[in-house]
């Protein structure tokens, strides 16, 4: 289980392999940092946008993880379990294209997680001399980490909500997002987003009070309390 402040916040965790980084507004864009492969399909795509002013090359690295988080254990995926195409993309400034992911793993009731790292590489190596006398790149390599969730092929979406105790539990075998907005007139920035994996439980005082509380599953909003008029927020 992990939490994100602000229900519409999609802050990228960027690893810049250079001390002289370009503005983040002029870098790779991949949309939501968590994306899912639905239980009824074996294919999902991810759009990559080159927001730079010059061409870039994009590559992918994939690791299987036991569970997303700071203490996750990364391993090499089983050969043939998760494939992607193409091997790399070359995009001019402003262009976009899709990487496609194909799942050929077990068709059971277990959810699987993968760390997908998108690597943005300049097509030319421009350097600038640093104050110490060395050279640094003026167009850095950028790595953006995302999480691909392969939902169980035998999926069970189940949850429970106890307003008395302020508790939401994931009693199924696949993840969903919980949006908690205190009060009926609170803004998106005042809310919280919780990502619940199977077995996760969230205890929050706000869940005992009136507010706009939703589950988001497969891009669908599910209102879990009737204390406020229905007004679905953004799923980002």
From Swiss-Prot:
Supply the SUPFAM superfamilies for this chain. PapD-like (SSF49354)
Q: Which residues form the signal peptide?
A: 1-27
Phenotype seen when the gene is deleted = Mutants do not express ECP and are defective in biofilm formation.
Q: What induces it?
A: Negatively regulated by H-NS. Positively regulated by IHF and EcpR.
Instruction: Give the family, as the similarity comment puts it.
Output: Belongs to the EcpB/EcpE family.
> What this chain does, per the record?
Part of the ecpRABCDE operon, which encodes the E.coli common pilus (ECP). ECP is found in both commensal and pathogenic strains and plays a dual role in early-stage biofilm development and host cell recognition.
The protein here is known as Probable fimbrial chaperone EcpE
């Amino acid at each position: 289980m992990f939490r994100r402040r602000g229900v519409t916040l999609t802050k990228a965790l960027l690893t810049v392999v250079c001390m002289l980084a370009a503005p983040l507004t002029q870098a790779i864009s991949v949309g939501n940092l968590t994306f899912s492969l639905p239980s009824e399909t074996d294919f999902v795509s991810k759009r990559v946008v080159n927001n730079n002013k010059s061409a870039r090359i994009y590559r992918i690295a994939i690791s299987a993880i036991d569970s997303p988080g700071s203490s996750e254990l990364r391993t090499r995926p089983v050969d043939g379990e998760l494939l992607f195409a193409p091997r790399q993309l070359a995009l001019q400034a402003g262009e976009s294209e899709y990487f496609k992911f194909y799942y050929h793993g077990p068709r059971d009731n277990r959810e699987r997680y993968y760390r997908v790292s998108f690597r943005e590489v300049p097509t030319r190596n421009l350097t600038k001399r640093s104050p110490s006398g060395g050279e640094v790149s003026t167009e850095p390599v950028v790595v953006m980490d995302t999480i691909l969730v392969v939902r169980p092929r035998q999926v069970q979406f189940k949850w429970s909500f106890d307003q008395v105790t302020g508790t939401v539990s994931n009693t199924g075998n696949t993840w969903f997002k919980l949006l908690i907005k205190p009060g009926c007139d609170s803004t998106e920035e005042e809310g919280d987003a919780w990502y619940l994996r199977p077995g996760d439980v969230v205890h929050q005082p706000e869940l005992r009070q009136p507010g706009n509380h939703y589950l988001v599953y497969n891009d669908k909003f599910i209102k879990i309390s009737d204390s406020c008029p229905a007004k679905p927020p953004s799923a980002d």
